[in-house]
Curated annotation (Swiss-Prot):
Protein name: Putative S-adenosyl-L-methionine-dependent methyltransferase Rv1729c
Superkingdom assignment: Bacteria
BP term (GO), one: methylation
Organism: Mycobacterium tuberculosis (strain ATCC 25618 / H37Rv)
A GO cellular component entry from the record: plasma membrane
Keywords noted in UniProt: Methyltransferase, S-adenosyl-L-methionine, Transferase
EC top class named in words: transferase
EC number: 2.1.1.-
Binding site for S-adenosyl-L-methionine: D130, D159, L160
Protein family membership: Belongs to the UPF0677 family.
Length: 312
């Protein structure tokens, strides 16, 4: 089904199911003996979503090599890709708070459990923004598990295509305080102009010393429907409602490194291969064109007030 400007989802459909797939990756990486990450909430959250394929993966009845019809080595590289991505953003947030930042905003948080699993400094406030159905599911499921946030967690149930800056501030966000922003696994699901508006609003809400992290798929402009079907079909054959070709926005868009730099940030990018190398993994398995980006805001000259106008 084609995307619309007001489409919505839960964790079993549309963009929402991709959040569940990413959580599956974190659960598998947590089980991996290398111990690159530890997300104890990924597996119970995946099980609570209730999709049979993912439950069987958690039980060890199915693995990625069988599902995607790839070699065990390629399947393992997929797990490592999730692990190093998660570790990169974990380290970014921990470094930001170690530097004194006490306000964190996680955009399109999905089944992200960092507000519960990371060792946050005292008085750190973590804002999570996502679709209302997604936020309600995660909050309720983690409460039923007896999980307690390790930070002051504030859920902001709103679509990022709506006026989320106003909703964020209504939840207590202080734009005068430095913030660590995280936009993980998000940009490919946004129109090019919506991606720009996202970073415009982040910049407008950011005090000097704020930080931002995201990832940018350099080949998204040329991402073909055939490639999308190749990725989606193994899941669809097992009853998962995902059609990547209809979810991803392709075509030319601004490179995030350039766009952030023009807005007064000092961003730096690192390749997936480099993240593999840092973790002692075979870089030949990192055949992905994703760049992981983080940076600090030092210049306010390009800032204008946040707005939802033209968000879609």
């Amino acid at each position: 089904m084609a995307r619309t400007d007001d489409d919505n989802w839960d964790l079993t459909s549309s963009v929402g199911v991709t959040a569940t797939i990413v959580a599956v990756g974190r659960a598998l990486a947590t089980k991996d003996p290398r111990g690159l990450i530890n997300d104890p909430f990924a597996e119970p959250l995946v099980r609570a979503v209730g999709l049979d394929l993912f439950t069987k993966m958690m039980d060890g009845e199915l693995d990625m090599s069988t599902i995607a019809d790839v070699s065990p080595a390629v399947a393992q590289a997929m797990v490592y890709g999730n692990a190093v991505r998660t570790k990169y953003f974990d380290d970014y947030l921990l470094n930001a708070t170690a530097g004194g930042i006490r306000q964190v905003a996680i955009l399109a948080s999905g089944l992200d459990s960092r507000a519960y699993r990371l060792p946050w400094p005292t008085r750190t406030v973590v804002y999570e923004i996502d679709q209302p159905k997604v936020m309600e599911f995660k909050t309720t499921t983690l409460a039923d598990l007896g999980a307690e946030p390790s930070a002051i967690r504030r859920a902001v149930p709103i679509d990022l295509r709506a006026d989320w800056p106003t909703a964020l501030q209504a939840a207590g966000f202080d734009s005068a305080a430095p913030t660590a922003w995280l936009a993980e696994g998000l940009l490919i699901y946004l129109k090019p102009q919506t991606q720009d508006r996202l970073f415009d609003n982040i910049t407008a809400l950011s005090a000097p010393g704020s930080m931002v992290a995201t990832e940018f798929v350099t080949g998204i402009a040329d991402f073909s429907a055939e490639r999308a079907r190749t990725i989606s079909n193994p899941f669809r054959c097992h009853g998962v409602d995902v059609d990547l070709a209809s979810l991803v926005y392709t075509g030319p868009r601004n490179h995030v490194l350039d766009y952030l730099a023009a807005k007064g940030w000092q961003p730096e990018g690192v390749s997936l291969a480099e993240l593999f190398r840092r973790s002692g993994l075979d870089v030949r398995a990192a055949d992905d064109d994703t760049i992981f980006i983080s940076g600090c805001l030092t210049d306010h000259s390009s800032i204008s007030p946040p707005t939802a106008a033209g968000w879609r």
